[in-house]
C-alpha cells in the first residue's frame, strides 16, 4: 500500500472544487465538516475497480460509521471519456446503485488541463482513490487503488480516537501495488 504523498502528509486538505452535488441539499465544504473524520472516495462510473470495490466500500463505511463522527463523500472525477460520463449519466448511476452518501462532481476546466481541479489539487493518480482527512482538516491517508476494508477501518478508528490537536500516523501496513495497465481490477490510472 502506498503511503500518503510526502508533500500532502498532514497538510490541510484542499477544498473540494465541484460543479455540482448529488444526495445533499447544500454543497458540502471540508471547512463545514471540521470535527468529523472525512472519507473522500473518488471514482468514475466506467472504472471497473470503482464499481467492483471502491463504491461498495464507500457504501459500507457510510452504513457502519456514525454520520455525526464520519462523513463519507464521493467525488466523481472524470479524466477520460468526458462525453459519456456527465451529470445525467451520473444521476442514473447513483439511482441504479442506490448510493446515499453525498457525491460532488469534480470541476473540469477543459481538455487543455485534462484532469479535474480537485483531482489535480490532491495529486491523484487515478480512480478509485481514497483520502482520509482528520477532524482538524488535515490529509492523513491518500491511496490510489483498492484498500482493504480492514485497513480502512483501522485508519478511521485511529483517527476517531485522536483528540483534535494530535496528528499520529494512521497508515496501515504496506501491501503490493497494482499492475502497469491503465485499467485493471484495482482501478484506472492516468
What are these regions (language model features)?
Residues 42-44, 75-78, 106-108, 145-146:
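Active-site-proximal beta-strand/loop segments in catalytic clefts of secreted hydrolases
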Residues 28-54, 58, 72:
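Short active-site neighborhood of thiol/selenol oxidoreductases, capturing the structured segment around
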Residues 97-99, 106-155:
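Thiol/disulfide oxidoreductase modules built on the thioredoxin-like
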Residues 35-38, 68-71, 98-102, 135:
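Loop/turn elements at helix/coil->beta-strand transitions in domains of secreted/extracellular proteins
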Residues 32, 66-67, 96, 123-125:
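Extracellular/periplasmic catalytic domains that process cell-envelope and extracellular macromolecules
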Residues 1-34, 154-190:
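Non-globular targeting/processing and membrane-anchoring segments
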